[in-house]
């Protein structure tokens, strides 16, 4: 039943007796019986073992049920533009679950106090389990009235004479560099700008208002592009792709609520 050989049981008993400092069993060629000290020890530990088994069963039951509180940290752009509009589907599917969500694009200690984190960029934390959700293109865009005033770039180098809406790298505190990919070609351009932001939705709003040219993920830009509020520039140089990953800390089977959220986010990402 325990999966131990007789010699293994004997060694385990010997270690236990050495640990407690008393002889727990009387051994004879015919039988093994409890000593008086062994009977007292058995009477004291039996309720504790029963409580431990009950706690283990409770924990296993909780881990198998999608309920309780799930704490997640999600990239602001993905949270606002893709995930939030679909949350009613998630909460309807799991009525016993409370979703406690914070938004952040910082990667340092991103798992502090949360069960799942969702971030753009390649995985760089070996201790975490990373599930790739999607890849999205990086587009360069501007408002039509800005392009009417300043002209439309026809090559990446033309942006050196334009005003950029810059986005701050949360890891370095400096603006992200602007890269352009076309086939095997890679071009980096030093784009100047007097506005630096750390929230992509605010940066898009500034771009729509005519502040300048902005680089953004294609994911979530559809409404502005479809309405004509934003126009893509340099479409031939838009092959750079950026991944989105979901992270959780355990290499063992995660609780059901974590698996449910990961599967839902994967589902949402596939339809984005």
Report each predicted region and the residues it spans:
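A short LG(V/I)-centered, amphipathic sequence patch enriched
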Residues: 17-34
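C-terminal regulatory
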Residues: 108-113, 123-244, 270-272
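Central regulatory/effector-binding core of bacterial HTH transcription factors
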Residues: 68-126
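Conserved amphipathic alpha-helical core elements
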Residues: 16-17, 230
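A bilobed periplasmic-binding-protein/Venus flytrap-type ligand-binding module shared by bacterial periplasmic
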Residues: 244-253
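Helix-turn-helix DNA-binding motif, specifically the short coil turn and the N-cap/start of the second
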Residues: 3-8, 12
């Amino acid at each position: 039943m325990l999966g131990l050989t007789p010699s293994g049981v004997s060694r385990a008993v010997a270690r236990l007796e050495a640990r407690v400092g008393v002889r727990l069993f009387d051994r004879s060629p015919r039988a093994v019986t409890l000593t008086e000290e062994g009977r007292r020890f058995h009477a004291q530990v039996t309720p504790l073992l029963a409580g431990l088994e009950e706690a283990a069963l409770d924990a296993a039951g909780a881990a198998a049920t999608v309920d309780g509180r799930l704490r997640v940290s999600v990239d602001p752009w993905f949270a606002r533009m893709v995930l939030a509009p679909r949350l009613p589907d998630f909460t309807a599917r799991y009525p016993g679950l409370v979703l406690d969500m914070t938004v952040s694009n910082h990667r340092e200690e991103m798992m502090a106090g949360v069960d799942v984190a969702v971030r753009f960029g390649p995985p760089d934390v070996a201790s975490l389990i990373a599930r790739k959700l999607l890849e999205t293109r990086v587009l360069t865009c501007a408002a039509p009235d800005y392009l009417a005033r300043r002209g439309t770039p026809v090559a990446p180098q033309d942006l050196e004479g334009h005003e950029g809406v810059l986005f701050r790298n949360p890891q370095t505190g400096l603006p992200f560099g602007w890269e352009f990919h076309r086939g095997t070609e890679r071009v980096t351009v030093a784009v100047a700008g007097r506005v630096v932001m750390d929230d992509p939705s605010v940066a898009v709003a500034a771009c729509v208002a005519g502040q300048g040219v902005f680089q953004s993920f294609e994911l979530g830009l559809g409404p502005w592009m479809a309405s004509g509020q934003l126009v893509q520039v340099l479409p031939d140089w838009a092959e750079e792709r950026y991944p989105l990953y979901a992270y959780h800390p355990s290499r063992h089977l995660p609780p059901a609520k974590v698996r449910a959220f990961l599967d839902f986010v994967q589902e949402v990402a596939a339809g984005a």
